[in-house]
Every structure is written in structure tokens, then in C-alpha cells.
Amino acid sequence: MRLVYGLGRSGLGVLRFLRKRGLPARFYDDRPREEEVREALALGFQPDWNLEEAYEEVVAAPGVPLDHPHLKRLAARGAKVLGEAELAYRLSPTPIVGITGTAGKTSTTLFTAHLLRAHGLRAREGGNVDPPLVSVVDEAEVAVAELSSFQLERVHAFRPRVAVLLNLGVDHLDRHGTVEAYHAAKLNLLKNLTPEDALVYNRLDPKVRRAAEASPARLYPFTPGSTPRETNLRAALEATRAYLDLLGRPLDPGAVAEALRTLPEAPHRFQAFARKGGVVFIDDSIATRTEAVRAALEAAPAPIAWILGGEDKGADLAPLLPLLGRVRVALALGRDGPRFARALEGRTEVVVIAEKDGRTAMRKAVEEALSRLEQGSVLLAPLAASFDQFRDYKDRAQAFREAVFALGGEPWTPSSS
């Protein structure tokens, strides 16, 4: 018997995937939402709120750390803990292009799927980017999976036909503890590759290059470009070339040229989506690293009402301090909001949003922002993980958008002005 630990988009996706196959399971969530429990019950699954049964496998949502007491107790009773990527690989024959790295995963995943579709393949993206991988493998000829360290730390036999390793930086130290443990989780993408598989890698990242050169897979190096977008596109082109090589097909320059005209944009990545008077609202919910937040603070129209906070991942605020002259107010929410507030005090106005419920806190933050701005921008660039108050960064972005529209924001993009 399997236990699906954690509902949300990943857990419900797993339950749908299992139902298609007629496979039994129970479910558990330590913060259950009524509508998600209803859906799980409607799919024909029952909860195990006391975690009393013995399970062979536990499919844990990526937001649940492996050292969670429940997972440790279930593992001690003989359960193997895995994630949706492992489950998708085991139960579906669809080949997978797996993409990871500290930065650029989402765009590279979207670009790769787009380029493969331009070559006539039924390619679908999933994983860390919507939808879950288990939701696309049954519909796809090839699945392109964005894989986070949280997902890769719980793979066992998982073997993509093409692996893409973009870079190895510093992130998620709150979860993994050390840079070495974080990198080890990322490198799980490579651990089951064979000479029949392909590995696309960044030739200028020394740690990436060393890992690639130790792999038995066929190597496809790429050189980073002058911008993140160019770098991600180069990686996607090599990933497309590598997968086509497995099929015995060449890269089609005409198909590539056509695809480049319609490249997709990553959601929740510095998206201006609404306006109220002279104030623009920018969703950069995916900006959890210092480098990404710095770029957002540089680009957002000043004065800025900056919404940040959540679960601190060990962020370094020092590079952001010179930009606080552009910030009218910092609105710090979530578990570690007070810690961020203390670090910013005396450099700009800081308001701690104490509400515990994520959506209530987000609405309060937007209200506080609008009370201080007549022009400029309200920027959600959290510099922190979302799991303290939200399902994931997408849920956090949705809460921001709901608050903006509830408080009088009107849909708007730069191209509509």
C-alpha cells in the first residue's frame, strides 16, 4: 500500500495518476484544505489521519523535508520515501528530459518543450513548473521535467534519457544544511545515466563540468550567453539536439527559427500584471535568491513597496542594501518576516505583517503598500520559500494577484499601455 503524503497540486496529481492505473493508496496532509480533501475523496481514496497503517511506499510532496518526524517514523517502519518524479518514471514508459540547476530551470524547461514541439513531437513540460510531472507523462510523447533539489533528493531509480545540468550555486541551505548536501541532491539527476543517455551541461561551471566528465552519458556541453535568457536558450537547444539525436533525427534550423519567434515566458518571473492609478503590480514570486531579488529591485519602477518574507533559505541581504533607496516601504510577512525586518530597519520603512494566514497576510501587505504609494510599483520578490504560509510559490503568487484585484487593481501589462 502507498501513502500520498501532502495534497496540493503534487499530491492530487499523484492520486489522479494512481487512480488511472487502478492502484490503491491512502492520503495524509498536516494542513489539509477542505476542497483538496473533497477532491481526494471523490477520486476514491481515503485518508489515514493517524498514520497508523504500514506502507511499502510513501510518495511525499516536495515541500515535506526528508527529516520530517512523520517521514522518519514511516521510513523506520519499512516505507520507502520517494517523490512524484520517481513514481512517474517507474509507472510510465514516457521518456523524460530532466532539467535542474540553481538558476534558469523554469525557462530552460519551457524553451526545451517548445523547441521539441516545433520539431513535431508531442512534448509536455511539468514537474516543478506546472503541472506536476505525473500529470503530463501519460499525455506526452516526451516529458520535459523541471526538477528541484527537493524533488531530486527523493529519487532512487529515476533515469532521464536527457539530463540537463545548468549550474550549481548556493540555495536552500535552510533545507539541505550545507552547500555540499544541496549539490548532492542536484547531482542525483545524473546518478543513473548510462552510455545510452545524454547529458547537457554548462562547460564554464567547474563543479558542473567535473560531474559531467565523470558521467558515462554522451556529453553535450553548452557555453553560457551574455544574459540569463540567452544561456537558457542555448541549454534548451542542446537538450533538443540531444533528444533528437536519440531518435536519429537532426535539429531542423527552420523549425528552430520559427520556434524562436514564439518563445514562452516563465510565469511569476517579474510579471507586471495589474495597475491601479500610477501604481504597477509586479509578480516575481519565483525570486527567492539574492541575485534574482537584486535584479527585480533594480528593474521595478520606483518608489517600490517591496513584499518579502516566508521561510528564509539563508539569504544574504548585503547586496540588496544599496538598492533600498528605491524602496519606499518593505512589507515583511511569513515565518521569518521579523528577521528580515530587523535586517532592513533604519535603511527604509519596514512593516511587519503579523497575520499567520497567508492570504490574509498578503492582502494586508497590499493594503499597506497602496496606503503609501501614488505611483511606482508594488513588487512581490520574497527572497524566501513559501511553504510556511502557502503550498508553493505559485500559490503565493495567486494570493498576491487575488489581493491586488480585490483591492481595485485592474489587469494590465506593459504591452497594453
Swiss-Prot record:
InterPro entries: Mur-like_cat_sf, Mur_ligase_C, Mur_ligase_C_dom_sf, Mur_ligase_cen, MurD. Pfam families: Mur_ligase_C, Mur_ligase_M, MurD-like_N. It is found in: Cytoplasm. Keywords: ATP-binding, Cell cycle, Cell division, Cell shape, Cell wall biogenesis/degradation, Cytoplasm, Ligase, Nucleotide-binding, Peptidoglycan synthesis. Its EC number is 6.3.2.9. Transmembrane segments: none annotated. One of its GO terms (molecular function) is UDP-N-acetylmuramoylalanine-D-glutamate ligase activity. It catalyses: UDP-N-acetyl-alpha-D-muramoyl-L-alanine + D-glutamate + ATP = UDP-N-acetyl-alpha-D-muramoyl-L-alanyl-D-glutamate + ADP + phosphate + H(+). It comes from the Bacteria. SUPFAM superfamilies: MurCD N-terminal domain (SSF51984), MurD-like peptide ligases, catalytic domain (SSF53623), MurD-like peptide ligases, peptide-binding domain (SSF53244). Pathway: Cell wall biogenesis; peptidoglycan biosynthesis. One of its GO terms (cellular component) is cytoplasm. ATP binds at G101, T102, A103, G104, K105, T106, S107. GO terms for biological process: cell division; cell wall organization; peptidoglycan biosynthetic process; regulation of cell shape. Cell wall formation. Catalyzes the addition of glutamate to the nucleotide precursor UDP-N-acetylmuramoyl-L-alanine (UMA). Belongs to the MurCDEF family. This is UDP-N-acetylmuramoylalanine--D-glutamate ligase. It comes from Thermus thermophilus (strain ATCC 27634 / DSM 579 / HB8). The lineage of its organism: Bacteria, Thermotogati, Deinococcota, Deinococci, Thermales.
